[in-house]
Amino acid sequence: QLVVVTSSGTDTLAAEADVYTDRSTFQGYGDAGTLRIDDDAVTLVRFGLDAYAGQAITSATLRLYKLEDYGGATRDIGVYRANQGLDRPLTPPVQGLAAAYPSDDGIAAHPSVLLFADFEDPAFGDAWSVVDHAEHLELVDATEGNGFHELDGQALRVEVGAGDNYGGSLRFRYGDETGSEPDEAWFRYHLLLGDDWLPTDGGKLPGFAGTYGVAGWGGRAVDGTDGWSARGTYKVPVAEGDNPLAGHTSIGSYVYHADMQTSYGDIDLWVDGCAGVLEKGRWYTIETHIRLNTPGVNDGLLEGWVDGRLAYQRTDWRWRDVSTLAVEEVWMNVYHGGTATPPSDLHLYIDNVVIATERIGPMGR
């Protein structure tokens, strides 16, 4: 209950909706008869306050009634205003080297750029060290449909077919293309989710890796000496309904690292400012920056940027205990699952990829 006091009197309101969430699952427990409060649960409660528009509220008191007490421990309960982020004013984007190149024209000539891919050439695969599952990759233009519209000419369509896990995979291997492997790297791509983007499981998106064909993907846990990876990830879209985030897809990082506790990577979502929550049919500028840790020290840096705004930053990663592990490749990987496969075809679109040795940022306008 919420007890609201105004100059007109006192009202006791019942909740319009409530749910608690547990970190162990993306599911919400909105259909439960009670709410739970503990260290791993967040409770959300909504009260209808439209009737008080224009009135001065003297006080508002939240009343919670305890039904059960497990373990006898006391809890400090914090009460906050929930803000999903979509209504926050956007901060100005942070620019990088791309700001000097409207529509990325001429950016390939910049001395810090190692690769620029705009997918205008049917032989686009020649610029990459490895192309896997090429049958899932196709160049498309404005006639595509499916919510697609051109960013800057043609784009690369990636398909995950019904009953399949694989999208496509492009690999830029630093050793093959530049002669050495760095400890720090940047890459940026543009991403649009098609209207048919309805995955039934989370999966993988482009990122960095140093698996060396040994460990760091597919349940091959790492130990600090044999490999690592920091690919992107996506989660199942928010269910349709009375929710401003309905249909949106959260993205983040999927990381195999030396402190991992299971055989599979850990997920960190890019949720700062709600920047890593994507809607279908819109182009986003996605940039990742990695600086590998000092061997044996938890000081590795991983950053994610969306449309030039910092969406994620973590500074305590430990990927390696030996200096022989470096940034082996940019892995433009799209994969559904896990092991679950979608019941229908899914499509996303990629354009204007830049791999560089410094911050790239959004394309110039």
Where do the language-model regions lie?
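Low-complexity, Ser/Thr/Pro/Gly-rich disordered linker/stalk regions
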Residues: R88-R365
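Extended extracellular/luminal ectodomain segments enriched in beta-structured repeat modules
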Residues: A41-V42, Y52-L62, S180-W186
